[in-house]
Curated annotation (Swiss-Prot):
Belongs to the chaperonin (HSP60) family. The gene is groEL. GO terms for biological process: protein refolding. Pfam families: Cpn60_TCP1. InterPro entries: Chaperonin_Cpn60_CS, Cpn60/GroEL, Cpn60/GroEL/TCP-1, GroEL-like_apical_dom_sf, GROEL-like_equatorial_sf, TCP-1-like_intermed_sf. Keywords: ATP-binding, Chaperone, Cytoplasm, Isomerase, Nucleotide-binding. Its EC number is 5.6.1.7. Residues 524-538 have a biased composition (Low complexity). Residues 522-544 are annotated as: Disordered. Forms a cylinder of 14 subunits composed of two heptameric rings stacked back-to-back. Interacts with the co-chaperonin GroES. This is Chaperonin GroEL.
């Protein structure tokens, strides 16, 4: 297809229009008084959300050049979500400010490379200062506060704190949809290991790119499966029962993998294959753990067992299995409590006996997975639309809480970004590099400005007042009061704030140094073809 190219000012102006359209949509959701956005769906009812990354990903603009600008900012939100799990709206607001102010200066004749250098230096200074003013999370109360701010709901905050208390900071917490209207927390025996599906065609949820198996059989083996004939009799029995199957093996390759994928796509049966976790002797031990949890048997040559002779009774069972590209979570395994308790005692004895710190750490990981269980948050709501919106909020809250446990927390509501202004302002450079620093100084004020404007206040007035307050004191948009943010429970994970700034600065700096944009040339016949398709009688020359 022929290409169309725009250069310098034309290219940047078109991309900026796209940036503004996306960012102006997303930033209306920022803060406790942020609004919702309604997303049209090709099927089902419209979706109502205030989740920044969900909104950003759903926006496609008709103009190719504008769409490129929008997609680059959507990438900022997506990357921040991947790293920290929250802060996507803040990242979008920061990116828009840096891009907009940067393009003004580039248009006025500034050197974009110098501006980029200034942006990078200012961002590093801001991130270093964020780490200095960060506080460690101590106890259930602070965990609940982080989750409450992220979800704008104190009940959700308490729920996440309870879940973390029950399974530990590193424990597995999953979020499911409930059939009722109440949101509940339960802890079930379960395990998670760091192996994902071998083919993305095995997923059952294309939005989340994960596979959910209800009440599946689980084949556990340390062998490599390359010939489908080895497990064909077993597969036929499972298909007859209408059950799903999880295969945990050394590898699934050769003709076996495409055959399984083909049967999954055709709807013959639901199957997911993953590689066994660990390596060497540690892999064998982990497979035994999984077998104990699910009430199955490891099909291994060491035990004189062959795949061809495997019976249904030797397979494990579980209430639910969720597989993503990176992890497999087994919930409600069918193993007996006595067998699990015995296995736990064996691992505890091994921990006491070992002299290796590395081995002790790995054994403790196995113990946590086997004995800790999985916390399941069942999200309830009156309608499907409300259910989806509430689920997004709880997922954000969980991600924010984990980020806070990892790197600590700072004052929320955009206060921390204003608190680091003096450290950034202390940088003194020449010319366009200083211009880049000034651009970041302005951008750091933008989240507070937007939160205030969403609450019906004059953003500039709030920002100027905030600069006069002592560190940690900020504007609480929910109560319209000036408060010590940490004492009021308005705190953000340091990792979320840091990631939002770093990702925004990175993409903004790249956009400012863009000199040409290449896009597909619009097809002049496309509209004519569409019109003809919409009117079957078109071109039939009066044959009536």
């Amino acid at each position: 297809m022929a290409k169309e190219i725009k250069f310098s000012e034309d290219a940047r102006a078109a991309m900026l229009r796209g940036v503004d359209q996306l960012a102006n949509t997303v930033k209306t959701t920022l803060g406790p008084k942020g609004r919702n956005v309604v997303l049209d769906k090709s099927y089902g009812s419209p979706e109502i959300t205030n989740d920044g990354v969900t909104i950003a990903k759903s926006i496609d603009l008709e103009d190719h050049y504008e769409n490129m600008g929008a997609k680059l900012v959507a990438e900022v939100a997506s990357k921040t979500n991947d790293i920290a799990g929250d802060g996507t709206t803040t990242a979008t607001v920061l990116a828009q400010s840096i891009i907009r102010e940067g393009m003004k200066n580039v248009t006025a004749g500034a050197n974009p490379v110098g501006i980029r250098t200034g942006i990078e230096k200012a961002t590093k200074a801001a991130v270093d200062e964020l780490h200095k003013i960060s506080h460690k999370v101590n106890g259930k109360k602070e965990i609940a506060q982080v989750a409450s701010v992220s979800s704008s709901n104190t009940e959700v905050g308490s729920l996440i704190a309870d879940a973390m208390e029950k399974v530990g900071h590193d424990g597995v917490i999953t979020i499911e949809e409930s059939k009722g209207i109440d949101t509940e927390l339960s802890v079930v025996e379960g395990m998670q290991f760091d192996r994902g599906y071998l083919s993305q065609y095995m997923v059952t949820d294309n939005d989340k790119m994960e596979a959910d198996l209800d009440d599946p059989y689980i084949l556990i083996t340390d062998k490599k499966i390359s010939n489908i004939q080895d497990i064909l009799p077993l597969l036929q029995e499972i298909v007859q029962q209408g059950k799903a199957l999880l295969i945990i093996a050394d590898d699934v390759a050769g003709e076996a993998l495409p055959t399984l994928v083909l049967n999954k796509i055709r709807g013959t049966f639901n199957v997911v294959a993953v590689k066994a976790p660990g390596f060497g002797d540690r892999r064998k031990a982990q497979l035994e753990d999984i077998a104990t949890l699910t009430g199955g048997t490891v099909i291994s040559s060491d035990l004189g067992l062959d795949l061809k002779d495997t019976k249904l009774e030797q397979l494990g069972r579980a209430g639910k299995v969720t597989v993503t590209k990176d992890n497999t979570t087994i919930v409600d395994g069918a193993g007996s409590k006595d067998a699990i308790a015995e296995r736990v005692n064996i691992i505890k004895k091994q921990i006491d006996d070992t002299t290796s710190d590395f081995d002790r750490e790995k054994l403790q990981e196995r113990l946590a997975k086997l004995a800790g269980g999985v916390a399941v948050v069942k999200v309830g709501a009156a309608t499907e639309t409300e259910l989806k919106e509430r689920k997004y909020r709880i997922e954000d809250a969980l991600n924010a809480t984990r980020a806070a446990v990892e790197e600590g927390y700072v004052a929320g509501g955009g206060t921390a970004l204003v608190d680091v202004l003096p450290a950034v302002a202390a940088l003194k450079e020449e010319g366009d590099v200083q211009t880049g620093i000034n651009i970041v100084l302005r951008a750091l004020e933008e989240p507070v400005r937007q939160i205030a404007e969403n609450a019906g206040k004059e953003g500039s007035v709030i920002v100027e007042q905030l600069k006069k307050e002592k560190q940690g004191v900020g504007y609480n948009a929910a109560t319209d009061e000036w408060e010590d943010m940490a004492k009021s429970g308005i705190i953000d994970p340091t990792k979320v704030t840091r990631s939002a700034l770093q990702n925004a600065a990175s993409v903004a700096a790249l956009m400012l140094t863009t000199e040409a944009v290449v896009a597909d040339k619009p097809d002049p016949n496309a509209n004519n073809n569409a019109a003809a398709g919409a009117n079957p009688a078109a071109g039939m020359g009066g044959m009536m």
